[in-house]
């Protein structure tokens, strides 16, 4: 008999989790594709360090703001906005690459903007989960989210190499853009979510975890 994790028996969390599973794999695909892309653009090792800087600085700057907003505004709506923004940025990266207009500045700029979006998305996501499952299933829900993140970190790099070899660099970014639709569709399908404004339930600490699932 197949055991279904308790959190996945709740429809709205199930939608979100499967959407995140797809999206996180797409984000990891893009991350490793960017590393490879930079290697093809320059032989300077420091250029790779620039990606890390572009990913972490915006989160340090905006994480507390993102946490405060997640405590007061509609978290589902925040995620709809941030996920759409992340998809559009990935699409821009794909288009610039396909048109041959890509360079290090564009890569850093888009990476930084995606990190800004993640600084608002991550705390909203953490705060949304308690509205989707009862308190008794919260530990299981957060464990499943960690599993989704780690699965993406394993699957993403392998898929990225395969797509680059078979289709080209720009298609990795395009696939990532499409992967965000999985979360957007999940958020739409779950409908309105009742939530209480509970100041202090989301902290900057949750937002400062970008390298796990940064889109």
Regions found by a protein language model. Name each.
Residues 1-215:
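Alpha-helical transmembrane-bundle signature of multi-pass membrane transport and export proteins
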